[in-house]
Amino acid sequence: MANICANMKRCFSPPALRAYFAEFFSTFLFVFIAVGSTISARMLTPDETSDASSLMATAVAQAFGLFAAVFIAADVSGGHVNPAVTFAYAIGGHITVPSAIFYWASQMLGSTFACLVLHYISAGQAVPTTRIAVEMTGFGAGILEGVLTFMVVYTVHVAGDPRGGGFGGRKGPAATALGALVVGAVTGACVLAAGSLTGASMNPARSFGPAVVSGHYSNQAVYWAGPMVGAAVAALVHQALVFPTVPEPAPAPATNESARHGSVQTVVV
């Protein structure tokens, strides 16, 4: 009971509140760019014909959007920007379950607010949701989302491991920027590879906000189950098979439990 009370108390400490806000704002930024680029592409091709240039534009927008989102939050919250990433770090013991729940809430709120703002400033344009292509089954789409998320989350783990260079405070802003760029790049590549099949969400928050604002919740299970399973496998593969030794955490203030995993410093409270 004492441990539970202590954990809950740390969940509302000033460093924790800053971490939650960082997750809210960074997720807001990423989803605003990701969904906004999709709206722009749709306005340029209103007949909804297949357009490779539109796919390229949204992939580039998401790559640079995630790059910026991870970079600005890396030293405060770890720059998760994705409930699947948070889930992976919780499995690895780098963030407590109560903290993960608050991270998820912040990410969901950030995504929803981004879509609300887009809806109202775009003259009432419908907010596009991630959808499964007619050629895909729900099961197949879930597997694909899991594979894509595995690649992204595994990249996050490798790019963030200090034994391979690390980033997020330990190695300086240049290393943070490089790691964030790598994560953004693999995300953009995955959008190019599977954007026409499932929308290449790889991020439950990316699908949740548009669903709430649009009111269309079809196939939400695909965009939650697939990424969560893929993230869990990525965490286990990296931590148990590839790099089984957990890095020592960097010194942190006595009021915090600093859980670093490479590039990502997660303030666990």
Curated annotation (Swiss-Prot):
Family to which the UniProt record says this protein belongs: Belongs to the MIP/aquaporin (TC 1.A.8) family. TIP (TC 1.A.8.10) subfamily.
InterPro entries (UniProt xref): Aquaporin-like, Aquaporin_transptr, MIP, MIP_CS
Domain of life, source organism = Eukaryota
Main localisation, per the record?
membrane
Expression across tissues is: Expressed in leaves and anthers, and at lower levels in roots.
- Describe the task this protein carries out: Aquaporins facilitate the transport of water and small neutral solutes across cell membranes. May be involved in transport from the vacuolar compartment to the cytoplasm.
Residue interval(s) of motif NPA 2: 203-205
Q: Listed disulfide bonds for this chain?
A: none
Chloroplast as UniProt keyword: no
The reply on keyword Ribosomal protein is no
For this protein, the parts annotated as crossing the membrane are 19-39, 54-74, 84-104, 139-159, 177-197, 223-243
Q: Which SUPFAM superfamilies match?
A: Aquaporin-like (SSF81338)
Protein name in the entry: Probable aquaporin TIP5-1
- What does the UniProt entry say about where the protein is found? Vacuole membrane
Q: Where is this motif: NPA 1?
A: 82-84
Q: What is the lineage of its organism?
A: Eukaryota, Viridiplantae, Streptophyta, Embryophyta, Tracheophyta
Record Pfam families: MIP (PF00230)
List the keywords (alphabetical).
Membrane, Repeat, Transmembrane, Transmembrane helix, Transport, Vacuole
Per the entry's comment, what about the domains? Aquaporins contain two tandem repeats each containing three membrane-spanning domains and a pore-forming loop with the signature motif Asn-Pro-Ala (NPA).
User: What membrane topology term does the record carry?
Assistant: Multi-pass membrane protein
Mention one GO biological process in which this protein takes part, according to its record. water transport
Name a GO molecular-function annotation. Answer: water channel activity
